[in-house]
Every structure is written in C-alpha cells, then in structure tokens.
C-alpha cells in the first residue's frame, strides 16, 4: 500500500476518490483523499426489498464490519464471529452474535461487507443463518471480484451464486434452495453487467463529485 500511495501522490492530483477502502490506512497515506462510502446503494437495496414487502435483518460477517457499517441503520442487526483453522487461517465456520436465535427464524437477511472474492466468508455466514431458520438471504458488497464464480462450496463444489441449501421437510422430503438469493454490488471492479444472480450499481462522476470535502463519504453537497 505504501508504494502504491507514493505512486499516486507523485501525480499530484487535486482530489483522489477511494470507494469504501478495506483499511483506514488508505486515507492516511494518499494525499487529497476523499473516501466514498456506499451507504446510498445499501439504502437502494433496502428500498427495493421493503417495496417487495421484505424488512430484513442486517448481518455483518465480523465485528469489524459491524463497527464500520452499523452506525445509523434503523433495522435490527447481528454480526458473525469466524472460526478459523489454526495455522492456515482457513475459515471453518461462523457463529452468530448480537441477536437471539429465535429472532432469525423465518426472517430475511441482508449481509453487508466491503469485498467478495471467492465468497468463503459469505458461504459460511449464509449456511449458519439458514441452519438457524433464516428465509431468503441477500448480499451487498461494495466490491465484487470475478472470482465469485470460482469458489467451490458444498458437496457438489458449486460457487457462491449456485450452491444449494438442503433442508429436510416435516414429511421427510428434501427441499433445495439457493444459499444466497441475490448479490448486490457496484461496478468498482465487477467486470460484467447485472444478471439474474447479481445487480450491479454504477459508480459515476456525479456521485463522486457530490461527496463533501471532509472525506467522510457523506453527500452534504447535494443539500447546498
């Protein structure tokens, strides 16, 4: 990051827009940096869901995401605690905290985080939430890599967008449902157009220009 920041700084830009960086170090090392959050897109997703009669619970995959994104939200939320393999750091599972298990049952969930690569974090989060009785699960990430199609999960080694969740009914039959019902993201790095599995919101110049000079990602200029 240090050398990347030095390269950008050497170009002497008047303003540098950075969308929802994974680390706060970015804003500290890049000169004239304006951090843009993606709250407006999350609000759009919530509006879409509420319009369809869905009032979801917000879920953050870890405590860090909760601290970054929970401020000001007006719906119930919970967060995850990842269980990792000692030595490799590989994710083995996830526990849900901050909400009673019975409050998950039958509810729709919107998972929010900054980036999705192959989707292991979201696979284990969604799997745990489904086991707790969650109904539909949606995912919003600010940045989505093409490798979301490469992750191999479940017995059939399917990717995050196609992997099934199997549930035995009271009659003994097996019900198959998608683990993640839909993904929402921006076109910050996502190379494709929206499809049946993914909705892509466009980042544009007007959006960036309306960010205030304080660098916090708010849009107070729109009110002036």
For each of these PLM feature ranges, what is it?
Residues 1-224:
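PRPP-associated nucleotide enzymes
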């Amino acid at each position: 990051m240090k050398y990347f920041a030095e390269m950008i700084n050497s170009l002497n830009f008047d303003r540098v827009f950075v969308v929802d960086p994974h680390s706060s170090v970015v804003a500290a090392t890049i000169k004239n940096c304006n951090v843009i959050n993606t709250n407006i897109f999350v609000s759009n997703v919530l509006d879409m869901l509420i319009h369809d009669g869905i009032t979801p619970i917000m879920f953050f995959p870890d405590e860090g995401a909760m601290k970054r994104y929970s401020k000001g939200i007006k719906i119930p939320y919970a967060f995850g605690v990842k269980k990792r393999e000692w030595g490799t750091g590989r994710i083995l599972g996830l526990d849900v905290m901050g909400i009673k298990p019975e409050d998950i049952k039958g509810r729709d969930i919107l998972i929010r985080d900054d980036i999705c690569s192959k989707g292991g974090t979201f696979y284990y989060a969604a799997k745990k939430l489904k086991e707790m009785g969650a109904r539909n699960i949606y995912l919003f990430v600010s940045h989505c890599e093409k490798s979301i199609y490469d992750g191999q999960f479940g017995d059939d080694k399917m990717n995050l967008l196609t992997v099934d969740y199997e549930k035995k009914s009271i009659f003994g039959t097996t019900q198959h449902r998608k683990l993640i019902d839909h993904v929402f993201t921006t076109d910050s790095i996502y190379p494709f157009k929206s499809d049946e599995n993914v909705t892509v919101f466009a980042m544009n110049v007007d959006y960036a220009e309306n960010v205030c000079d304080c660098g916090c990602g708010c849009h107070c200029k729109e009110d002036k």
